[in-house]
Regions:
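Long, charged, low-complexity intrinsically disordered regions
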Residues: 1, 36, 76-78
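Positively charged, polyanion-binding regions of nucleic-acid-associated proteins
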Residues: 1-20, 40
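Residues that form generic nucleotide/phosphate-binding pockets
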Residues: 11, 29, 44
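Short acidic, hydrophobic short linear motifs in intrinsically disordered regions
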Residues: 18-29
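Short helix-coil junctions and helix-kink-helix linkers
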Residues: 27-38
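Charge-enriched amphipathic alpha-helical scaffolds
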Residues: 36-57
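Short, cationic-aromatic polyanion-contact patches
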Residues: 59-78
Length: 78
C-alpha cells in the first residue's frame, strides 16, 4: 500500500485549486482492495486536517471534523 497521506496531497496537487476529492479516490489510488484501505485514508485525512494541510466539506459546506460523508480540499478553498 502507498502512503495515504502522500496520495491525498498528490491527488489534490493535480486538481484545480478549488477542486475537492473523495476519500475513496485516495483509497483506489493506493490499494487494489480500496475498501480495505479506507481506515488508513481516514486516519491520514485526520492528520492532514490537524496539520492544516487540507480542509473537509460536504455539499459545499465546511466540516470541522470528519463525520459521515465528506470531501477533501486544499485549505482556504471555499
Amino acid at each position: 500500500m502507498t502512503d495515504p497521506r502522500a496520495a491525498v496531497l498528490s491527488l489534490l496537487a493535480r486538481r484545480t485549486p478549488d477542486a475537492t476529492i473523495c476519500p475513496s479516490e485516495v483509497a483506489r489510488a493506493i490499494a487494489p482492495d480500496w475498501r480495505g484501505a479506507m481506515p488508513a485514508v481516514h486516519t491520514a485525512v485526520d492528520g492532514l486536517v490537524r496539520d492544516g494541510l487540507v480542509r473537509l466539506s460536504w455539499k459545499g459546506r465546511p466540516l470541522s471534523t470528519r463525520s459521515g460523508p465528506y470531501r477533501i480540499g486544499r485549505p482556504g478553498d471555499v
